[in-house]
Amino acid sequence: MTSTQRTLMVMAGGTGGHVFPGLAVAHRMQAQGWRVVWLGNPAGMEATLVPRHGIPMEYVRFGGLRGKGLATKFALPFNLLRACAQSLRALRRVKPDVVLGMGGYITFPAGLVTVLTGRPLVLHEQNSIAGLTNKVLAKLAKRVLVAFPGALPNAEWTGNPIRTELARTEPPQARYAARSGKLRLLVVGGSLGAAALNEVVPRALALLAPDERPQVVHQAGAKHIDTLKENYEAAGLSCGSDVALVPFIDDMASAYANADLVICRSGAMTVAEIAAVGVAALFVPFPHAVDDHQTTNAEFLAEQGAAVLVQQRDLSAELLADWLRGQSRDSLAAMAERSRSLAKPDATDEVARVCAAVAGANQEGKQ
C-alpha cells in the first residue's frame, strides 16, 4: 500500500447474493488502483471464496439479529458486543477511506462501528425488500443504494453489480433473430438445485409432442443430478441430444445468452443477470425466502411484461406444458427485449463511483 492509495473495506457474507455483487465492485475498485480488504464471517462462504480472488480478509463472528430460539435471543447482547469489538479491531487495522456494506449478518455490527468511529458508510441492498440490517443502517449511512426501486426510502437506484461478461452479451434482438429450429430451454436450480423444478419440468416436457419439446439444458445441483436423471427417465425422456443434465454451470453468461427461455428461482442476482443479458424467464420464487423477497424480485420484471411469475404452489406439469405450447421464439424475444430495457448494466461502475465520491468528500471534510 502506497501513502496515496485509498482503501475500500467491503462488508458482505453468508450467501452468494451478497458476496458476488461485492466481488464485482471490489474488482472494479482494484482496477482503479484502490486497495480492497473484505470483512466477513470465518464460517461463511466468503471465507473460502474471497481469498481465491486475491482479496485479503478480516473476520467477525456474528449470527444475526432474528431470533432462532430462546437461547439465541438471550445470547444476542453478548454476541453483538463481541462482534462490535472484533469490528473495531478490524477497522483500526485496515483504516478504510470508505466502507461498503453489501449485506449479511456481519454488516450490522461492523456497520454500527463504522459510523460510531466516524468512517463513511455506503450501503447497497440487493433485494426488492430490504433486510433488517439495512433498514437500520440506512438511517446512518452516507449513501444508500438499491437494486430495485423503492426497496429503501431516499435511496439511489443503481441496480445490482454483476460480472462484466454478463453486461457485455450481444443484444437479444440479434441473438434470437439468428436462431431457428427448436426453442432452447435453460432450467437453473442454483448450486443446491430446486426440487420443485427438478420434479415438474420433466413431467411437463413429457406432455408435449416430440416436435413441441425444446432443447433442454437442466442445471440440477451436484447432489440432485442422479435424482433428476431418474425423473426424466420416469417421464419417458432420455438424457441425450435434447436434454443435457449438468450439476453446475461455470459460464452463466454464455448459458443465458444461448437460451431462448430460462426457468429458475428469482434471487436478486438471478433477476439482475437475466435482465442484463436480456433473456425471457419464467420465475418460480423460493417460497420460504425471508419476507418472500423472491416474489417481489420477480414482480419487478413480470409486472412490465419482461418475465412470467408462477408461484411454486401453482406450478404443475399441466400448467407448464400448456404455457410452453403457447410460446414462440418471437414472443420470447419480445419478452427478452423488455427485460434488457429494464437492466442496469452499469451498476458495478455506479456503485464504485459512489464509494469513491463518498471517500473523497470525507477526505475534503477533514482538511
Curated annotation (Swiss-Prot):
<keyword id="KW-1003">Cell membrane</keyword>
<keyword id="KW-0133">Cell shape</keyword>
<dbReference type="Pfam" id="PF04101">
    <property type="entry name" value="Glyco_tran_28_C"/>
</dbReference>
<keyword id="KW-0131">Cell cycle</keyword>
<dbReference type="GO" id="GO:0008360">
    <property type="term" value="P:regulation of cell shape"/>
</dbReference>
<comment type="pathway">
    <text>Cell wall biogenesis; peptidoglycan biosynthesis.</text>
</comment>
<keyword id="KW-0961">Cell wall biogenesis/degradation</keyword>
<keyword id="KW-0808">Transferase</keyword>
<dbReference type="GO" id="GO:0009252">
    <property type="term" value="P:peptidoglycan biosynthetic process"/>
</dbReference>
<keyword id="KW-0472">Membrane</keyword>
<dbReference type="InterPro" id="IPR004276">
    <property type="entry name" value="GlycoTrans_28_N"/>
</dbReference>
<protein>
    <recommendedName>
        <fullName>UDP-N-acetylglucosamine--N-acetylmuramyl-(pentapeptide) pyrophosphoryl-undecaprenol N-acetylglucosamine transferase</fullName>
        <ecNumber>2.4.1.227</ecNumber>
    </recommendedName>
</protein>
<dbReference type="GO" id="GO:0051991">
    <property type="term" value="F:UDP-N-acetyl-D-glucosamine:N-acetylmuramoyl-L-alanyl-D-glutamyl-meso-2,6-diaminopimelyl-D-alanyl-D-alanine-diphosphoundecaprenol 4-beta-N-acetylglucosaminlytransferase activity"/>
</dbReference>
<dbReference type="GO" id="GO:0050511">
    <property type="term" value="F:undecaprenyldiphospho-muramoylpentapeptide beta-N-acetylglucosaminyltransferase activity"/>
</dbReference>
<keyword id="KW-0328">Glycosyltransferase</keyword>
<keyword id="KW-0132">Cell division</keyword>
<feature type="binding site">
    <location>
        <position position="163"/>
    </location>
    <ligand>
        <name>UDP-N-acetyl-alpha-D-glucosamine</name>
    </ligand>
</feature>
<dbReference type="GO" id="GO:0071555">
    <property type="term" value="P:cell wall organization"/>
</dbReference>
<comment type="function">
    <text>Cell wall formation. Catalyzes the transfer of a GlcNAc subunit on undecaprenyl-pyrophosphoryl-MurNAc-pentapeptide (lipid intermediate I) to form undecaprenyl-pyrophosphoryl-MurNAc-(pentapeptide)GlcNAc (lipid intermediate II).</text>
</comment>
<dbReference type="GO" id="GO:0030259">
    <property type="term" value="P:lipid glycosylation"/>
</dbReference>
<comment type="similarity">
    <text>Belongs to the glycosyltransferase 28 family. MurG subfamily.</text>
</comment>
<dbReference type="InterPro" id="IPR007235">
    <property type="entry name" value="Glyco_trans_28_C"/>
</dbReference>
<dbReference type="GO" id="GO:0005975">
    <property type="term" value="P:carbohydrate metabolic process"/>
</dbReference>
<dbReference type="GO" id="GO:0005886">
    <property type="term" value="C:plasma membrane"/>
</dbReference>
<dbReference type="GO" id="GO:0051301">
    <property type="term" value="P:cell division"/>
</dbReference>
<feature type="binding site">
    <location>
        <position position="294"/>
    </location>
    <ligand>
        <name>UDP-N-acetyl-alpha-D-glucosamine</name>
    </ligand>
</feature>
<dbReference type="InterPro" id="IPR006009">
    <property type="entry name" value="GlcNAc_MurG"/>
</dbReference>
<feature type="binding site">
    <location>
        <position position="249"/>
    </location>
    <ligand>
        <name>UDP-N-acetyl-alpha-D-glucosamine</name>
    </ligand>
</feature>
<feature type="binding site">
    <location>
        <position position="191"/>
    </location>
    <ligand>
        <name>UDP-N-acetyl-alpha-D-glucosamine</name>
    </ligand>
</feature>
<feature type="binding site">
    <location>
        <position position="127"/>
    </location>
    <ligand>
        <name>UDP-N-acetyl-alpha-D-glucosamine</name>
    </ligand>
</feature>
<feature type="binding site">
    <location>
        <begin position="15"/>
        <end position="17"/>
    </location>
    <ligand>
        <name>UDP-N-acetyl-alpha-D-glucosamine</name>
    </ligand>
</feature>
<keyword id="KW-0997">Cell inner membrane</keyword>
<dbReference type="Pfam" id="PF03033">
    <property type="entry name" value="Glyco_transf_28"/>
</dbReference>
<keyword id="KW-0573">Peptidoglycan synthesis</keyword>
